[in-house]
Amino acid sequence: PTYLSIVATIQDIDLNSKSTRFDEPVGIAFANNAKAYVALSSTNRIAVVDVASRKVVSHLEILAQEPRAIEVRGGRLYVIPFESNNQTQLSGGKPEDLDGKLVTFDARKLASSFDSVGFTVDVVKQPKIPDKDLFIFDTQTDKLVSTVDTLGASLFGLTVDASGNIYVANTDARNHVNGKAGTEKHGLKELDNRPYLNRVSKVSAAGGVDFFQLNPLPPRQPNRQEAVATPFAVKASRDGDVLFLTGAGSDVLLALSAKTGEVVAKAKVGSVPRGVALEEDASGKPIRAWVMNAVSNSVSKVAIAGNSALQLEQTIELHDPTPPVYKEGRMAFNTARSSSNGTFSCASCHADGHTDHLLWVLDTPHLVG
């Protein structure tokens, strides 16, 4: 079969102002030969594009931060926001709502104060905060069909198998685990040096949600050499038995059981792998994976045997004018090798050099003006 594909989406430049138009197209999927969808990350919208005229004919509003990964399957458009949240906030509220748990201080008084000295401030999970992580649209009507909540905090990759099961590669922040800095004097110790869980969230065709943890859950620590950090790109085999997943912080390609989440094979690839595509034989069995390594600017050609065993065949270096010292810095920023347990990197909190927009208790020195 022939598949429509795209090499890249490119940010438009206003030639008069010499600036970008600030819609940041980062993902594309085709409903059919006549209609395409483009994720506009910075504007929290999906552009609906008429292929024949190459014009944007409408937009789908995404009520979440930075929609990036999108996929069309079975008459449905699936969208996940890159910078989701995990319902955490400061434990402030109205005086009449003080309960010592979700509300521990008067937010109005803190707002007029220089700093938080004298206030009992925690980071808490507030269940009333919206946390929509998956948006599903009908590709004929472009109407929103359903949403799914609380799949993760930073959502990177998305795949849908032939049976309608949805898999989201993500990290889930644990900033609430040591969040009781005010009421219980929490600090970094309570975090167990595990700020994030690296996982794949599965939404079954029937709507059930399961989480495939790629490392042992705290307080257990993984073998540093076997740990997986920053699951990014994910692709399901045609038969739905195997997931092929990149670990962007670990420079690996993984094969996972789609039923249990067990890692059944692993291959070392280039620096910061963020894309994967499968090559299949006539029967639909995957025979090769092509992995895009974002920071080393290379493509890894990985042989697949028996639907899961992985063997690196070749690394194809692409032309890259980036100064070597810049690339080395980006590698250091994105790799989890500097962490004691191999589960997080600088980029875990600061993906693409930005922030995760979450509150953390980090035992940093108090600042005095």
Predicted regions: what they are:
Residues 33-34, 74-75, 163-164, 239-241, ...:
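Short coil/turn segments that connect the beta-strands within blades of beta-propeller domains
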Residues 82-128, 169-198:
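Short, conserved, GDST-rich strand-edge loop motifs in beta-rich repeat architectures
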Residues 38, 79-80, 168-169, 245, ...:
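Residue position within the beta-strands of beta-propeller blades
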Residues 3-20, 83, 103-115, 129, ...:
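Surface-exposed loop and turn segments in beta-propeller and other repeat-based domains
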Residues 341-353:
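The canonical Cys-X-X-Cys-His
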Residues 17-32, 63-73, 131, 152-161, ...:
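Beta-rich, blade/repeat-based domains predominating
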Residues 2-3, 50-54, 138-142, 204-207, ...:
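Short loop/turn segments that connect beta-strands within beta-propeller blades
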Residues 42, 83-84, 172-174, 249, ...:
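Residue-level signature of beta-propeller blades and closely related beta-rich strand-turn architectures
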